[in-house]
UniProtKB/Swiss-Prot annotation:
GO terms for molecular function: ATP binding; lysine-tRNA ligase activity; magnesium ion binding; tRNA binding. Its cofactor is Mg(2+). The lineage of its organism: Bacteria, Pseudomonadati, Pseudomonadota, Alphaproteobacteria, Hyphomicrobiales. GO terms for cellular component: cytosol. It is found in: Cytoplasm. Its EC number is 6.1.1.6. It is an enzyme of class 6 (ligase). The keyword Disulfide bond does not apply. Homodimer. Binds 3 Mg(2+) ions per subunit. Keywords: Aminoacyl-tRNA synthetase, ATP-binding, Cytoplasm, Ligase, Magnesium, Metal-binding, Nucleotide-binding, Protein biosynthesis. Mg(2+) 2 binds at residue 415. This is Lysine--tRNA ligase. It catalyses: tRNA(Lys) + L-lysine + ATP = L-lysyl-tRNA(Lys) + AMP + diphosphate.
Amino acid sequence: MTDTKTETTALSSDATEVRRQKLALLREQIGDVYPAHFHRTLSNAELAEKYADIEADVETGDTVTVAGRVYSSRNSGMFMDIHDASGKVQIFSHKDTTPEAARNLLPMIDIGDIIGVTGKVRRTKRGELTINAEEITMLTKSLLPMPEKWHGVSDIELRYRKRHLDILANEDSKLRFLQRSKILSGIRRFMEAEGFLEVETPMLQTVYGGATADPFKTFHNTLKMDMYLRIAPELFLKRTLVSGLSDKVFEINRNFRNEGVSTRHNPEFTMMECYWAYADYEDIMGLVERLFETLAIALHGTTEVEFQGQTISFKGPFKRVPMPDAVKEATGIDFLAIKTDEEARAAAKAAGFAVEKDWTWGECLAFIFEEKVEATLIQPSHVTHFPKDISPFAKEVPGEPRLVERFESYCNAWEVGNAFSELNDPEEQRRRMVEQLEQAHARGEKDKQLDDEFLDAIDQGMPPAGGLGIGVDRLIMLLTNAPSIRDVILFPARRNKAD
């Protein structure tokens, strides 16, 4: 290689242009600046583990090959820190130990470049594990400057738009996404240990259902038909339960809802949904508690988790409270003593709540719960006995036909889980779904259709079952101390830059 010192003095002062000029020089001098393959003998973490016991100011004589991105460079490249996904190692280049060809490459290396290094392992007098460079290989020339390492990417929107920079510069962000992966793996292991079979159901559906939400609509050119990104996998998972493939099934996958964006809502989000034959919602409560406790211990070694300045305990059993009782305690309104929709609306208005003129008894109850009770549910809690009006897939509570065996799990005032004793009476299921369809059409949801294939499956006979859906992103927020859902989704929904 020719000497590059004099050539680099004439480079442009613009940082990006300097890098492009260096790239051009490197192409002339070494040819391929982006080689297809590089063999390293150890990751940086493996290197640190293997040589953890060597003392300061000791040279091992062992030759290793590592690779990583340059995060810092001092004394004209004499000292460089390179990072791979597992950690960092210091690289030392000196005329006494580093051949001229390798030293001549140093002026061409910028922060952010990815290099490979072969050399002898030693520990410095200050105790830093170091490789004395004997060969340096340019693996990737970065054409853009790195974010300032010690301050990271402080612009919140930029962090979401350019997540690669966020993770490159912010150790907290990197750790959070590593934890996300660990949580997802933990959910799978837990469900499999509980005897559940993981299945996959359609993301593209001809009839959307299983939840009340606006779908994303598309068109299949070959089949010449409208299709929808699923809003929930529920109806297909129940059809799987009918099939007898397994008495316990679950799915971890994306749902899509064409609705608002907030710190707790993203149009594309991850759910874990499961169905357990011959179980009811009481069994599912226990399942939720065991799952949350298992994940907290796996991630933090304890059930006590810090979230935004408060301690949340995931130690079961969680508090359980029927919705009518919670509303009565918060407002004094005894919904169980109210007999008609008109009386419910009048009681709500008398207490200062703005309810719609056509709302039912159950809709009034649920609305007041959301307004007055949700915000108080900081520690993990199960809210039970939901109104049947808003729960078309759940069994009635014996002796109280206006309520159903449904619960939602709350934490930090957020709903993180929703579960039923699943309705399996085919005639009652059809009646409720027809009623739900009529209500949707009255709201102007003309695309909403009756899922006849699901109803046919229920006619075949579905065993009694408990069903559960968990908002995985919100659960990850709680377990990783993330204030926004966009902090735990690698590439969250955002407006176009021009907007």
